[in-house]
Amino acid sequence: MTLAQQIAHPFCLAEALFFAAMLHQFRREVRAVQERAEASTILFQEQGFPLWRAIGPLLRGWALAHQGQAQEGIAQITEGLRAFRATGVEIGRPWRLALLAEAYSIMGQSEAGLTILMEALTLAETTGERWCEPELYRLKGALLLQQSSDHHTEAESCFHHALDIARNQQAKSLELRATTSLSKLWQQQGKRQEAHDLLAPVYNWFSEGFDTADLKNAKALLDELA
């Protein structure tokens, strides 16, 4: 970001804003995502970059959904998805669909979220773009539980699948998320020791980033399980 601003190259700044916003989204830093997304929207409108112009609404919508404005967030994410499709760009679509599914989850619309995730998982399978597959399965499990407590067996299977894929990818942050979701389910089922023993070694692997939402959530759950 600093270098892009120093050289005042619009396209480089556009790329820097996008990847900064994406990084903040991975870290679940909602306000930072919104700030980067809104800054990118202004730049992209000024410069007329069709591809990058789709980024602003997409990530701003995700941030709004996490700040009590889920309906507006869904509308913005949907707008961003349409703008991406108009450019013909398909790479990254499973991740973008995951943002929409998560917003539907916040809105309490589990059926709509599951429909979106089915599309995302199908795309991941057909295109081979699997880097966000652990999160897709984790979200699917969460939405199944939101839909009905009767779905706990299927949800647990989704969490296990997310965990296995994350381990195979050596994606520790996604492994932590999947493990936290599975451990939370086990806690609700009365399997407190199993939940603790699963989550503790994953959490203890980290040596930094303890200010991030995922690590805070994992630590809070471990404290409950202690």
Q: At which residue positions do the language-model features occur?
A:
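Helix-coil-helix junctions within alpha-helical repeat/solenoid scaffolds
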Residues: 1-226
